[in-house]
């Protein structure tokens, strides 16, 4: 197919126009008094949203070259959302400022490479300043504030803060479609895995179809249990204590199950299959052993069930099992051993490539942390529930980011107050490098300026007062006053703030160092061809 090309400054101008058009649709949504954007859909009612990534994902520009710029910046918002869960609009506001100012600098004769080096140096100074100023999160109130700002819903913020508080920042917290119109939280304490009882004849709670065993011993093995006699010795030892027995075994013969179910053993024994498959199963069994304080009677170590003693068995305060899931609550493992195992898995997770292996390690880390939570999204329609799930996921990412790396004053305050830091660190650098540094310094105040402008205030006055105020004092756009932002609960996770800036600088560097654009030649469609109504005459009439 024939191509059309655009070169040099005309190419960068086209990209900048596309970025500006996309940003114009996003910038007015920023802040507590930002306006909505309404997006038409081919079927159904329009989307009404103030979420930057939602709006950006719906925008395609008719000019192919301008659309390239819009799509590149849209990717910035999506990357920011994926990493930090929030800050999508801020990332696009920053990117637009850097790109428009950068293109203007290039037209004045600046060299793109030096300009971009200056941008990168200034950004890293700001990132280090933000990280060093981050305030650790130590209370539920702050987590709730972060989640509420990210989701724009105080109820969701409260549920997410409760979930993080109850299962920990490394615990499993997921979202799902609810069965009612209300959004609710369900928390399961302990380690859970997706394997249930192997026979419903083991059930102790008929109404819930669950097996609930109090203070059981837990036998873990990868051996194939072929005959009832293999378990006779260990069952006798457990029976002497008067406690029930949970067996987690890879394979157990039907005649063994029949023997276990007989003799009035309901409520005294539970058999479940081990979690996962392959080498992940072995790792999960080892995790279970550490959590419960037992050991895996393993084939490769020459283990024999007949020789198993009570010291080889794990314990727990309670074990609950349904047809699909087993939960071990308050395992009897040593706290120091569990912490060491968690640290080991966390290190493996950090070194693993971002694929299925990292996901599995993250799942193991969460299980070792001792809890799972599910937030069920309520709503009248599936569309409403889907939107709620998106908000939950974004707010959850933001809350976790805050718990892991801390918070900074929100409302654009932290970025705006980093401008003097850039001056002190890099103010003596001139030339094109200095031009890039100056560009970052001027762009840092843009989010605060748009928040003030969208609330009906004089952006220039607000920014000037903001940069002269003491650290942490920012502009509460909702009430039109300057206050201590952290005390007021107007905060952002530091990861959200520096990720937005880094991603904005990355895309700006890409645009400013682009010299050629290549696109397909638009195809001419003859309106008189095809089965259009009226033979195409209605199209000719519009033309």
From Swiss-Prot:
Positions binding ATP in this chain are 29-32, 86-90, 411, 476-478, 492
Entry-linked SUPFAM superfamilies: GroEL apical domain-like, GroEL equatorial domain-like, GroEL-intermediate domain like
Record's signal peptide:
none
Known EC number: 5.6.1.7
Q: Name one GO molecular function term.
A: unfolded protein binding
Q: Which cysteines are joined by disulfide bonds?
A: none
Known function: Together with its co-chaperonin GroES, plays an essential role in assisting protein folding. The GroEL-GroES system forms a nano-cage that allows encapsulation of the non-native substrate proteins and provides a physical environment optimized to promote and accelerate protein folding.
- Write down what this protein is called: Chaperonin GroEL 4
Q: Which gene encodes it?
A: groEL4
GO terms in the biological process aspect are: chaperone cofactor-dependent protein refolding; protein refolding; response to heat
Which key words tag this protein in UniProt?
A: ATP-binding, Chaperone, Cytoplasm, Isomerase, Nucleotide-binding
This protein's GO cellular component annotations are:
GroEL-GroES complex
Protein's organism: Bradyrhizobium diazoefficiens (strain JCM 10833 / BCRC 13528 / IAM 13628 / NBRC 14792 / USDA 110)
Coarse class of the primary localization is: cytoplasm
Q: Does the keyword Nucleotidyltransferase apply?
A: no
Please give the Pfam families that the UniProt record associates with this protein: Cpn60_TCP1 (PF00118)
């Amino acid at each position: 197919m024939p191509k059309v090309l655009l070169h040099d400054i005309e190419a960068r101008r086209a990209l900048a126009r596309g970025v500006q058009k996309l940003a114009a649709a996003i910038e007015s949504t920023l802040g507590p008094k930002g306006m909505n954007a309404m997006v038409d859909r081919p079927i159904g009612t329009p989307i009404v949203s103030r979420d930057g990534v939602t709006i950006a994902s719906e925008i395609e520009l008719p000019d192919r070259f301008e659309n390239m710029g819009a799509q590149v910046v849209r990717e910035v918002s999506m990357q920011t959302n994926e990493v930090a869960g929030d800050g999508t609009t801020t990332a696009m506001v920053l990117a637009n400022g850097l790109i428009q100012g950068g293109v203007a600098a290039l037209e004045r004769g600046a060299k793109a490479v030096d300009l971009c080096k200056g941008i990168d140096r200034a950004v890293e100074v700001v990132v280090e300043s933000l990280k060093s100023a981050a305030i650790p999160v130590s209370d539920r109130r702050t987590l709730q504030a972060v989640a509420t700002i990210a989701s724009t819903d105080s109820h969701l913020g409260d549920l997410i803060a409760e979930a993080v508080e109850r299962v920990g920042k490394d615990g499993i917290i997921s979202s799902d479609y609810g069965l009612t119109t209300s959004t609710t939280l369900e928390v399961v304490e302990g380690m859970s895995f997706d394997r249930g009882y192997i026979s419903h004849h083991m059930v102790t709670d008929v109404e819930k179809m669950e097996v609930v065993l109090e203070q059981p011993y837990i036998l873990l093995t990868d051996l194939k249990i072929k005959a009832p006699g293999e378990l006779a010795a260990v069952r006798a030892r457990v029976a002497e204590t008067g406690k029930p027995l949970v067996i987690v075994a890879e394979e157990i013969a039907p005649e063994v199950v029949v023997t276990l179910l007989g003799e009035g053993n309901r409520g005294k024994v539970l058999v479940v299959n081990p979690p996962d498959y392959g080498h992940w199963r072995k790792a999960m069994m080892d995790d279970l052993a550490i959590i419960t304080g037992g050991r895996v009677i393993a084939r490769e170590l020459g283990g024999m069930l007949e020789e198993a003693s009570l010291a080889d068995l794990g314990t727990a305060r309670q074990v609950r099992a349904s047809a699909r899931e087993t939960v071990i609550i308050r395992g009897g493992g040593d706290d120091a051993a569990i912490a060491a195992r968690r640290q080991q898995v966390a290190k493996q997770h950090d070194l693993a490539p971002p694929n299925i292996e990292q996901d599995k390690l993250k799942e193991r880390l969460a299980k070792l942390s001792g809890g799972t939570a599910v937030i069920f999204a309520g709503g009248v329609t599936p569309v409403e529930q889907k939107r709620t799930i998106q908000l939950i996921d974004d707010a959850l990412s933001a809350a976790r980011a805050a718990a892991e790396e801390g918070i900074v004053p929100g409302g654009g305050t932290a970025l705006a107050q980093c401008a003097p830091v850039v001056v002190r660190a890099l103010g003596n650098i001139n030339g094109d490098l200095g031009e890039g540094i100056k560009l970052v310094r001027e762009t840092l105040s843009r989010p605060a300026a748009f928040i003030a402008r969208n609330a009906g205030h004089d952006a220039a006055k607000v920014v000037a007062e903001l940069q002269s105020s003491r650290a942490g004092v920012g502009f509460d756009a909702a009430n039109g006053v300057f206050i201590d932002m952290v005390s007021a609960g107007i905060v952002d996770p530091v990861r959200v703030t520096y990720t937005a800036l880094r991603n904005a600088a990355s895309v700006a560097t890409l645009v400013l160092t682009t010299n050629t654009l290549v696109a397909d030649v638009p195809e001419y469609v003859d309106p008189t061809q095809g089965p259009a109504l009226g033979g195409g005459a209605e199209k000719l009439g519009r033309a």
